[in-house]
Amino acid sequence: FLPIIGKLLSGLL
């Protein structure tokens, strides 16, 4: 996954 996607996932969690 891209760093941006990972960052979004972390924000959701």
Swiss-Prot record:
Name this protein carries in UniProt: Vespid chemotactic peptide M
GO biological process, one term: defense response to fungus
GO molecular function, one term: toxin activity
Domain of life of the native organism: Eukaryota
Modified residues (Leucine amide): L13
Family that this chain belongs to: Belongs to the MCD family. Crabrolin subfamily.
Tissue expression summary: Expressed by the venom gland.
Remaining remarks: The primary structure of this mature peptide is identical to that of Vespid chemotactic peptide 5h from Vespa magnifica (AC A0SPI1) and Vespid chemotactic peptide VT1 from Vespa tropica (AC P0DRA0).
Protein source organism: Vespa mandarinia
Compartments (UniProt record): Secreted
Keywords, alphabetical: Amidation, Antibiotic, Antimicrobial, Chemotaxis, Fungicide, G-protein coupled receptor impairing toxin, Mast cell degranulation, Secreted, Toxin
Role noted for this protein: Antimicrobial peptide with activities against Gram-negative bacteria, Gram-positive bacteria and the fungi C.albicans and C.parapsilosis. Exhibits little hemolytic activity against washed human erythrocytes. Mast cell degranulating peptide. Induces the chemotaxis of neutrophils. Its mast cell degranulation activity may be related to the activation of G-protein coupled receptors in mast cells as well as interaction with other proteins located in cell endosomal membranes in the mast cells.
Any one GO cellular component localisation term in the record: extracellular region
